[in-house]
Amino acid sequence: MINAFKYKLIGDKPIVKLEEILKQQGVENVKDFLNPPIDCLENPNNFDNIEKASQLFNKNKKRNVSLVVDCDVDGFTSAALIYQYLMRCEFVNDIAVYCHSAKQHGVSDLHYALSKDESDLIIIPDAGSSDDEYFNQIHQTSCVKKDILVLDHHLRDKKLPKECTTAIIVNNQMSDKINNKTLTGVGIVYKFCKYLDKKQNTNYSDDYLDLVALGMVADKANLRNLESRYLVLQGLNQINQHKNKNLFINELIKCKKFSIGNEVTILDLGFQIAPMINSTIRCGVMQENNAMFQAFVNSEQTMRMYLRGKGEVKMSMQEYARRICETLVRKQKAKIAKYSVDIIKQINESDIKNYPVIIADVKNVENTFTGLLANMLASEYKRPVLCMRANKGILRGSGRGFEKGSINDFNQFLTDTQLFSMVEGHPNSFGVSIDIDNLDIFLDKLSQMEYNPDTYYHIYNIFDNSLGQLTVKHFGKYHNVYGNGVDEPLFVVKGIICNKYNIKISPSQKAISFKWHNIEFTKYSRSPMVDLIDELDKCFESGNGNIEIEVVGKFKLGSYKDSAMMIVDDINIKPTDKCRLFGG
């Protein structure tokens, strides 16, 4: 028997209005949240050092610039924005672009090359706020005096002096007069370009709001903040009205048209577009990452690629980079599948499978796949996961929480043990390190905790089998509201009667669907749902051929004439003597 899911109603009564859903998630002013006013934008003048940064630009006008591209979507969009802005303003003579050869941040791996090149100004977007040591090395080993500009949103290391003396840093976290701490790297770059626009009487920065939207969504900026939400929605409006300027973003959206439909949303950027870019950053070689950056800056260069059945084909840089992304998405999936076989075997053969937290040794897994593997394991075991590898007495890796379990904030849970030397990131997605001597103490704590395998869903309403299309469509039409700090609402539907002829199972066994009252219910899985299919067979055999279904999931609008759908997160089934009338 598979574990049945359980649920708790949010609030003291069922919720039927969008306003109530949003208020339950911490939205105070629903009207402004849905349509953020322009006066929610903070004045760029309030950033510490922004005038110094502007003067740095003027000092280096018509000189050579080195640009560091940080290795995530926020980093690529940040660098692409400042690159295009500089070229458009004719600020510089030449820009040398540096992509990382591995998943590293800042200039720790690039400082020697940066010190030896011919640049006068080094620009580091979305990183560098704590790289004083490497900036010192650049200044000491460079033959010419170099200026360094950091445009970042990460917290500065508390061990360092408050002010950096070897670079100019513009950072919302380090600016007391800036209230919005949710801006990501691309948001900081946009605000800086907005400041430059005002100084030179231009209006270029808004042309890059599609990059701002993608980078901020991918970096999980909390969009309950009105300024951040305003910027993302403005970028999405440009995309949906076909007024945006970035050719590569358009190319990626075009290839995902079937999944996305007619309107690109916050969730689409986060779950359809960003993963394609991340796959290239994780799996791609330097040449492929450089090609993707050129696609991001609207390069007009053409490339050639061999296509099966067509031979060598000439194509735009944007199509070339998109095809690289698609290839590397498949490569990434294959690698995760390969790694997961050994890791799951390792877990199942140890006592850790009975603990409230899964800990996996990922010494044979490439660093760039650690977080993805942790995601997969958290979904597989329905509990928090630590994937770590040992190096010089320290275990380092990634942590992923499971919000439907008993530990709501895995980051805080680990921090409270005071055993971990580093837990940095989001509540349920972060980097982690622990002294290997502390691991046994942590395991002892886990062994004393009672493990509750129940999966609890926090839901907004419970519907019986009289549920109709209008209710589903009412909630489904707000699909463009959710994402990045505002979760899609979950609902329960009870009492659905099905027979085996109503259930459709995909050939891969990764999708199970059925219809009720012309509402399409579908459950997807990353792996074949063997246990659920076996349970379905047993229930059909033990009753009169009918089963009663209870589901929890999200209401959606289908792409075909806005049909009513529910994407099922979890399902309970049992045999029943009740009959399904007239096909439901």
Predicted regions and their residues:
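Hydrophobic helix-and-loop "lid/oligomerization" segment in the mid-to-C-terminal part
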Residues: 2-121, 139-146, 197-440, 462-464
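Mid-to-C-terminal polyanion-binding domains and interfaces
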Residues: 59-61, 226, 312-361, 365, ...
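Catalytic metal-binding/acid-base residues of hydrolase active sites
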Residues: 72, 128, 154-156, 175, ...
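Short amphipathic alpha-helical segments
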Residues: 80, 135-137, 162-163
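Short gly/pro/ser/thr-enriched loop/turn and capping motifs at secondary-structure boundaries
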Residues: 104, 131, 154-161, 176-177, ...
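Generic beta-sheet signal
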Residues: 125, 149-153, 170-172, 388
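Active-site core of PLP-dependent enzymes with the aminotransferase class I/II
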Residues: 127-140
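Short alpha-helices
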Residues: 161-218, 425-426
